[in-house]
Amino acid sequence: MRALIQRVLEAKVEVDGQTTGEIKKGLLVFLGLGKEDTLEKGQKLIDKILKYRIFDDEQGKMGWNVSQANGGVLLVSQFTLMAQTQKGLRPDFGPAMPPSDAKALYEQLVEYTRSQFENVQTGIFAADMKVHLINDGPVTFNLEVEA
């Protein structure tokens, strides 16, 4: 399981011209699910994301998490994060969880995230999404939980 997190000033997801999720300051989280991933591993990753201190505190250092910064979370499924890219010139998506399983796990992780944090927005699983963002910094991190 992999998450690409970006500290943003604002972000939104559109599907067919309609906004499905939108936040102001906060975290844009792209989430990739692998074949061996579980709800337990996903919950550990979500907990880490919500506690990860990448927002400026009063001293201007990365000392606050998204809650302390009064931010939001925009959670977007992205199977391409699971691609193997070491060989060849085309990504291999073999390590990604099959869509039917991934959708169920993604929905459970959205529900879990909402149980842990108030301001959670999402994209639509497997939709052709347009993601708009203003990256703050830029500050971007790749977090991973091994399968």
Curated annotation (Swiss-Prot):
Any one GO BP annotation for this protein: D-amino acid catabolic process
GO cellular component, as recorded: cytoplasm
Keywords of this entry: Cytoplasm, Hydrolase, RNA-binding, tRNA-binding
InterPro entries: Daa-tRNA_deacyls_DTD, DTD-like_sf
Quaternary structure and partners: Homodimer.
Superkingdom assignment: Bacteria
Cited NCBIfam families: D-aminoacyl-tRNA deacylase
GO molecular function, a single term: D-tyrosyl-tRNA(Tyr) deacylase activity
Domain remarks: A Gly-cisPro motif from one monomer fits into the active site of the other monomer to allow specific chiral rejection of L-amino acids.
Keyword flag Cytoplasm: yes
Function: An aminoacyl-tRNA editing enzyme that deacylates mischarged D-aminoacyl-tRNAs. Also deacylates mischarged glycyl-tRNA(Ala), protecting cells against glycine mischarging by AlaRS. Acts via tRNA-based rather than protein-based catalysis; rejects L-amino acids rather than detecting D-amino acids in the active site. By recycling D-aminoacyl-tRNA to D-amino acids and free tRNA molecules, this enzyme counteracts the toxicity associated with the formation of D-aminoacyl-tRNA entities in vivo and helps enforce protein L-homochirality.
Organism: Acinetobacter baumannii (strain ACICU)
Name by which UniProt lists this protein: D-aminoacyl-tRNA deacylase
Reactions performed catalytically: glycyl-tRNA(Ala) + H2O = tRNA(Ala) + glycine + H(+); a D-aminoacyl-tRNA + H2O = a tRNA + a D-alpha-amino acid + H(+)
Enzyme Commission no: 3.1.1.96
Family: Belongs to the DTD family.
